[in-house]
A protein has these predicted regions:
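Short, surface-exposed amphipathic charged segments that create phosphate/polyanion-binding patches used
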Residues: 70-76, 176-186, 205-210
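Short, solvent-exposed amphipathic alpha-helical segments in soluble enzyme
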Residues: 21-23, 50-52, 126-130, 151-156, ...
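P-loop NTP-binding site
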Residues: 2-16, 23-26, 185, 189-234
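Short, glycine/polar-rich helix-capping loops at beta-to-alpha or helix-loop-helix junctions
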Residues: 42-46, 120-125, 147-154
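Conserved beta-strand/loop subsegment of P-loop NTPase cores
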Residues: 34, 108-113, 129-141, 156-171
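Canonical P-loop GTPase G-domain recognition
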Residues: 141-196
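Inter-motif core of Ras-like GTPase G domains
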Residues: 95-116, 124-133
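Nucleotide-state-sensitive switch-loop elements of NTP-binding domains
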Residues: 2-104, 118, 140, 173
Length: 234
């Protein structure tokens, strides 16, 4: 069983990249690809996968941290994929916060980021870019060559080890270049394997449903800012 993790900010083009990758793998290697989509409140991506006859399951974390929800269900997702006779499972994570850390050691890891998000955005994205094997840049056809080069330089500044590939989410151009960078080891199970980096910390009173504001309601794993004195701000 082959596994691939695909992470990135919302609306960066993760689903489009997976759709093109699944098509190329099917046409070139005869591999049957399935997808497990992890999201927070809602997702309509299942329709896009089903339209291309790609088996898909969608999990919504609702009021839980999407990262913790993801890692608690990825082993079960692999078992589903194996029982469905799939050759490769692509795990698409929600990527709702830049502290998300979905990549697993030895499992090929992609981070998708779009070129319209700002030239310094790569520096603001945490483990899902820093620990990725390959960074896929989408929407690069909308910006200039100079902007693409600056964006790529900022990516390499954060993760100099990763390959950087530009993929057109509409036409699929660049998908073959992406495929050439990927290596898919076989896994029977993820039992006892480790994440590449720790997940966002928990647990505070707001994690468990507290909605009131004030120091008296703030308990658990908290971090307070030091604003210093205000004398020089007057």
């Amino acid at each position: 069983m082959k596994l691939l993790t695909v992470a990135g900010p919302p609306s960066s083009g993760k689903t489009s990249v997976i759709l093109h990758l699944a098509r190329v793998l099917r046409e070139c290697s005869g591999l049957r690809v399935g997808v497990v989509k992890f999201d927070c409140l809602s997702s309509s991506d299942a329709e896009a996968y089903e339209k291309q006859h790609i088996p898909v399951r969608v999990g919504l974390s609702v009021n839980l941290c999407p990262d913790h929800f993801y890692i608690s269900n990825i082993e079960d997702a692999m078992q589903w994929a194996a029982s469905a006779g799939l050759d490769l499972l692509a795990a698409e994570s929600a990527g709702l916060c830049n502290r998300c850390s979905p990549h697993i050691r030895d499992v090929p890891a992609i981070c998708v980021i779009d070129n319209l998000s700002g030239s310094r955005t790569p520096e603001k994205i945490g483990p899902m870019l820093k620990f990725a094997d390959t960074v896929v840049v989408t929407k690069g056809d909308i910006v200039s060559q100079a902007e693409r080069e600056v964006f790529g330089r900022h990516i390499r500044k954060v993760n100099p080890r990763a390959g950087v590939v530009f993929v057109n989410g509409i036409t699929g151009q660049g998908t073959m270049s992406l495929l050439r960078q990927l290596r898919f080891p076989e896994f029977d199970t993820l039992q006892d394997r480790r994440l590449r980096f720790t997940m966002p910390s928990a647990l505070c009173s707001y994690c468990t449903g507290q909605t009131r504001i004030g120091r008296g309601y703030q308990m658990g794993n908290l971090r307070k800012m030091d604003f210093g004195g205000a004398e020089n701000d007057r």
